[in-house]
């Protein structure tokens, strides 16, 4: 419950930052004189048992009073719950003071939760790093193997290449055959590594779920959704990476095959192929394949960092004073910022609802 409260206070700070606090209190003031509107809002938002619903604003204020009273032990000092003023402006000022006081006491909890969740997400990144490192090592190794396997023009074959049309055409046709054969084999060798990456993502993200649960400010339901979303995103990105590597191989095969066909066609027309051009072309194409694939693997690694950082902000945002706290909400008069703030408030409502529901069930189970 402390984690949920901390998140609530953080978002109230964001309210002030994006200049929406006044509209919130205007709405609250109007609602104070309209009990039927309060009842409608409660019917739309509250999903716990009907017996726990309070239909009057006076009871809501009483609950707020008890809520503030329960915060007293956090400072180690018991105190009487403050009386709430009847005028909305006085209520606004008093609640602001209470929130500022409570936020100051709870910020250490929020900072610790943010740090703990971040540490667990960093653990996930460390666990996935060997998969990408292994993939890059395999790319480098397979490129070297391809270069050896496609080395059809050596000291012993230069004379064959220059010996006549038939010899040159036969050598270039052999190159075409080798290109198709060995690039296909490399594609098959990459598949198990890509599959291990996908499997590793699923396993390590589930381990993350268990390790981060005690520290997250989110409800268990929202935590599960965040973890499932992270697993799905990373899995899709890993599958897309495998598809791009295969596309790189297909392009390499097509380019080398086209070069060999062009050389064979020139040989038939009587042109003698340059013995140095063929190995140079093979080497350049292989280096381009290696370079492009390395960049794509690096992009995938950065995507892991980005997705895990986003999850950290969702599950355990930093304290309001932290530079990473809700940076997208600092754009005043921005419809996008208001939309994101609304989404976070809806998440907050779900967390509070689940926490109160769980507390209610625990009280019912007490003898």
From Swiss-Prot:
The source's domain of life comes to Eukaryota
What name has this protein been given in UniProt? Answer: Apolipoprotein A-V
Ordered alphabetically, the record's keywords are:
Chylomicron, Coiled coil, Endosome, Golgi apparatus, HDL, Lipid transport, Phosphoprotein, Secreted, Signal, Transport, VLDL
Q: Name one GO biological process term.
A: cholesterol metabolic process
Q: Gene name, please?
A: APOA5
Look up the record and report any one GO term of the cellular component aspect: very-low-density lipoprotein particle
Write down the Gene3D superfamilies for this protein, in alphabetical order: Apolipoprotein
**Organism whose genome encodes this protein:** Mirounga angustirostris
Q: Where is the signal peptide?
A: 1-20
């Amino acid at each position: 419950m402390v984690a949920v409260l901390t998140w609530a206070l953080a978002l109230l700070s964001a309210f002030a930052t994006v200049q929406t606090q006044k509209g919130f209190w205007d709405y609250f003031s109007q609602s104070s004189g309209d009990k039927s509107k309060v009842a409608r809002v409660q019917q739309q938002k509250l999903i716990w048992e009907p017996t726990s619903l309070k239909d009057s604003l006076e009871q809501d204020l009483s609950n707020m009073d008890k809520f503030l009273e329960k915060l007293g032990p956090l400072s180690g000092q018991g105190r009487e719950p403050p009386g709430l003023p009847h005028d909305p402006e006085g209520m606004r000022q008093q609640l602001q003071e209470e929130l500022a006081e409570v936020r100051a006491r709870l910020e250490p909890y929020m900072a610790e939760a943010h740090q703990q969740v971040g540490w667990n997400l960093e653990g996930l990144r460390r666990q996935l790093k060997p998969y990408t490192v292994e993939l890059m090592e395999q790319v480098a190794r397979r490129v070297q193997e391809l270069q050896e396997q496609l080395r059809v023009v050596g000291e012993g074959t230069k004379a064959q290449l220059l010996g006549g049309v038939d010899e040159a055409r036969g050598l270039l046709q052999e190159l075409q055959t080798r290109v198709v054969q060995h690039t296909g084999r490399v594609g098959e060798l990459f598949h198990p590594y890509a599959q291990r990456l996908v499997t590793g993502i699923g396993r390590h993200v589930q381990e993350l779920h268990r390790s981060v649960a005690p520290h997250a400010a989110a409800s268990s339901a929202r935590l599960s959704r965040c973890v499932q979303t992270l697993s799905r995103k990373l899995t899709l990105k890993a599958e897309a990476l495998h598809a791009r590597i295969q596309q790189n191989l297909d392009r390499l095969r097509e380019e080398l095959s086209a070069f060999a066909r062009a050389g064979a066609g020139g040989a038939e027309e009587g042109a003698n192929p340059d013995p140095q051009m063929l190995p140079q072309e093979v080497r350049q194409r292989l280096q381009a394949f290696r370079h492009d694939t390395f960049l794509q693997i690096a992009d995938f690694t950065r995507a892991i960092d980005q997705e895990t950082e986003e999850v950290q902000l969702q599950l355990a945002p930093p304290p309001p004073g932290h530079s990473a706290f809700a940076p997208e909400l600092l754009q005043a008069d921005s419809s996008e910022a208001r939309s994101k703030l609304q989404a976070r408030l809806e998440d907050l409502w779900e967390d509070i609802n689940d926490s109160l529901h769980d507390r209610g069930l625990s009280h019912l189970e007490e003898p």
